[in-house]
Each structure stands twice: as structure tokens, then as C-alpha cells.
């Protein structure tokens, strides 16, 4: 069985990213089962760069859309180009391993696989902290990491290495335009749970650097994008936690205003909370 990998590149040349370099290190047996689609959101078009051989296929797509330059358009484009049953989402700063891909491919090819499982993921670490997958029914997600196993509720995580059944994504209408970049991953997990499907966490650890862990490293624009997306997500999909989120933001505003945390852009948080949303959220999508 082959799988399609949607690798989303940004500022760095795709051949020099952590994820692409890790793919190049795979054995020929693994490479020959991978259809790689590199979707480049960066400022430089590398269409003229010679593509390495060894993969079942390797396609480079430069994003010429000047408005939408995020993960959603990358995933949606990869979905339409893929002829495989499964699509892996991959950030450019996640390091894949031979062990993980071998385990994943074995699971996907198993004849006794639970057909209700529509997503697989690894345990993702940033340093010593497991950042994905985690519980979803709390704002303190990192305090409740998920172990290997099959889940049908209370689970969320990042999109990198999340491998999705193509038919499931098509059945729910594709990747939501509500979240062109941030919180699309949380939306995906929420849709799996809402549609009573399952996620399997494989017993394998991978490394990924999560930028949101260090707020001081974020630009003003990036900070606003992350927190406005979080606010919209909880308002539309987790209303039971929305009141807690507002309290959390108020505390962050006070902390930022008093300059106890230079990473908090408190004016941006106020803007997020006061912004009047004129468009109704898409809501949860049920299977046909």
C-alpha cells in the first residue's frame, strides 16, 4: 500500500527542511511506497530545482495564491492530487523516522484493521514534553497527554504526521475554510469525534518544534492569527469551554499589561475578544 504525504513548506527551501531531509534518509523500500507532494507557501518558487529520485512519486507545487498561504490550501490541493487511500499531513519541521513509517504502513495494510479508524498519529514531543496527542475536553491539554491506543473521544493534537483516510475527508466536505492555518488540526480531531469515528495513536515518538510554546518568538501577526483562531474554534466547537477561555484571556491581558510576560500581546488579545464576528461558523459536518 502506498500513501500520499502532504509536506507544507514555508520560509526555508524545501530540500533543506527537517522533514524532507528525514524522508531522504528512508530506505528504498519505504521510499517506494511514498507519494510526496511538496506544497510551498514560501516567497521563492523552487519549481526549477531538480527533484531527487527514489520515491514512488515526488511532486512540487508552488502556491501562487496571494491571499491564502497556509495549511488548508496545501492539504486540500494534496487531497485532490492524491490517488491513495491515506493522506499524511506533514509540517516542514517534523522529523520522521523509519520505525514510524514502517509501523504506520503495517497498520494501514493490516487485514484486521478496525474500519472505524479514520486517522493515525504518532506521539509528538517538543523536547521532553509530549505536545500531541492530548485530551481535548480541557484547556490544559499538555497536562493530559494520550498514550498509544484507539480513541473515539477526548482527543486532539497537531496535524503534523496525522494520517487521514481520504474518503472521510471527502465525506465531510474537505478541509474547513474557517481555519486556513491555525487550529485546523483541532478542527480535524473534532470532526472525527463528532462523526463517531476513531483515531489510533501509534506507539512511536517523533520530534517537532512547536512555535507557540515560546510566545516571545512570535510576530504580532502570527500571535493574532493563533489566538483569533483559537477563540473562533472554542466559540463554535467547544462552547462548554468558551467561558474558561475568556477568563484565561483576561488573565493573560492583565499579565501582559503589567509586563510580567513580554511575549503576551495584550492589545491583540483584547482585539480578539472584542471583534464582532459577522460570518456564522460552518459548524460540525455530519457524514452523508
Residue ranges of each PLM-predicted region?
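A conserved acidic beta->alpha catalytic loop
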Residues: 22, 39-49, 94
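Short aromatic/hydrophobic "clamp" motif used to bind/position activated sugar donors
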Residues: 87
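Short, flexible, basic/aromatic active-site loop/helix in glycosyltransferases
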Residues: 135-155
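Short beta-strand-to-loop element that shapes/binds the nucleotide-sugar donor at the catalytic cleft/hinge
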Residues: 120-131
Amino acid at each position: 500500500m502506498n500513501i500520499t504525504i502532504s509536506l507544507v513548506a514555508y520560509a526555508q527551501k524545501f530540500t533543506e527542511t527537517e522533514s524532507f531531509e528525514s524522508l531522504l534518509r528512508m530506505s528504498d523500500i519505504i521510499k517506494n511506497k511514498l507519494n510526496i507532494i511538496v506544497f510551498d507557501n514560501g516567497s521563492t518558487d523552487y519549481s526549477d530545482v531538480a527533484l531527487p529520485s527514489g520515491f514512488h512519486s515526488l511532486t512540487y507545487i508552488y502556491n501562487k495564491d496571494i491571499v491564502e498561504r497556509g495549511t488548508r490550501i496545501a492539504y486540500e490541493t494534496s487531497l485532490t492530487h492524491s490517488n491513495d487511500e491515506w493522506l499524511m499531513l506533514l509540517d516542514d519541521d517534523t522529523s520522521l523516522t523509519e520505525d514510524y513509517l514502517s509501523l504506520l504502513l503495517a497498520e494501514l495494510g493490516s487485514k484486521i484493521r478496525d474500519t472505524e479508524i479514520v486517522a493515525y498519529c504518532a506521539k509528538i514531543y517538543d523536547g521532553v514534553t509530549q505536545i500531541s496527542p492530548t485530551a481535548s475536553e480541557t484547556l490544559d491539554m499538555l497536562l493530559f497527554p494520550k498514550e498509544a491506543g484507539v480513541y473515539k473521544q477526548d482527543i486532539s493534537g497537531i496535524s503534523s504526521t496525522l494520517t487521514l483516510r481520504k474518503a472521510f475527508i471527502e465525506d465531510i466536505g474537505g478541509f474547513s475554510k474557517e481555519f486556513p492555518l491555525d487550529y485546523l488540526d483541532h478542527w480535524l480531531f473534532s470532526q472525527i469525534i463528532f462523526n463517531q469515528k476513531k483515531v489510533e495513536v501509534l506507539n512511536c515518538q517523533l520530534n517537532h518544534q512547536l512555535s507557540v510554546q515560546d510566545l516571545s518568538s512570535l510576530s504580532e501577526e502570527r500571535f493574532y492569527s493563533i489566538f483569533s483562531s483559537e477563540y473562533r474554534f472554542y466559540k463554535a466547537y467547544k462552547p462548554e469551554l468558551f467561558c474558561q477561555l475568556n477568563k484565561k484571556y483576561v488573565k493573560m491581558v492583565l499579565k501582559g499589561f503589567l509586563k510580567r510576560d513580554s511575549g503576551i500581546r495584550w492589545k491583540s488579545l483584547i482585539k480578539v475578544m472584542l471583534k464582532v464576528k459577522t460570518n456564522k461558523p460552518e459548524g460540525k459536518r455530519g457524514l452523508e
